[in-house]
């Protein structure tokens, strides 16, 4: 909404209608001593052309994946976004509308969310999906709270290498709710050990969490982890990358009770870290504990199909202590991006994206491993992301490659670990991959 300043004449007319001589008469409750007595230190008045030039100048100091070749990953990935998505999402019915509190008035919005839910159920091989959570981290935290509520237990075990940011969000949720802290399983070769998990598991465990692929990009033994979790009556919670499911087994196929994920790779831009999209799916027997919004299909009195918000267990609708979650909204626009993305690609399309990402990442990993001084930190199978040990600090590699207009990856020293986390998507060409290897080999 544009800001159009009031003229002196506008101000006089408004004060006259209100029966006030000055603006100060409208704010008598604000003590005189804390009122601002001087003019704000603002830019001088500018024309539209001048404002546009100023903002473009400020924006030009930023860099983006449109201008640089990106190997950044660690939770946000540079996948191709078909231009049709923006065209459809930008329709005023979608872009400006917020689902009203009488939600059934917005049948188009509800149907779009319903289609998104249906796609997530198919992708994750689960029975029910909600309308989305804030992002992958909050979806995982809500999944753990749900597991605690369902089982009546308190302990939570992370079976493999979980994204550090997810760990922090999970810790915040659990501490605020007075629940037990998260226990980390031992790692070997970048993945969780089954012996370590078996030693940690007791009948006090509410949930066993695994990220697939994990933070390092490596593949965990999810089937064995799920069997161990269920052997002690714990719920098996999987945080699965949605693009990986074009190649890897879906969580529902290996026994996940709750499957969540970060939906950013599904047609959503990296956008400096958000807004993103939390995917949340469950098996049928847990549907009444699912948090967030849930859109269902029904029949109206004329027998026509209609869409409604169903099982409304949010604190907006019932007593707070009875609510399944205090998240009272959803990422509808981001979910729409994901639904359109998957609809445009189709089943074979998401397989192609996953295959290209995997093949190109393995090609790059093999080439980097042949550079003197560079090596792969882990030998475990991976999907599109891997950790490289470098002959110099990872931050130096990143700094040097920026001069070549390349985002070389994520510096793991941020998380008190050594290595460079490199991610490859279907966007990368062989020429770009070969150039990256050449530049790495030339570093001194």
Curated annotation (Swiss-Prot):
InterPro entries: GcvPA, GDC-P_N, GDC_P, PyrdxlP-dep_Trfase, PyrdxlP-dep_Trfase_major, PyrdxlP-dep_Trfase_small
CDD domains in alphabetical order: GDC-P
Oxidoreductase found in the keyword field: yes
GO MF, one example: glycine dehydrogenase (decarboxylating) activity
Complexes and interactors: The glycine cleavage system is composed of four proteins: P, T, L and H. In this organism, the P 'protein' is a heterodimer of two subunits.
Function of the protein: The glycine cleavage system catalyzes the degradation of glycine. The P protein binds the alpha-amino group of glycine through its pyridoxal phosphate cofactor; CO(2) is released and the remaining methylamine moiety is then transferred to the lipoamide cofactor of the H protein.
Descriptive protein name: Probable glycine dehydrogenase (decarboxylating) subunit 1
Organism whose genome encodes this protein: Chlorobium phaeobacteroides (strain DSM 266 / SMG 266 / 2430)
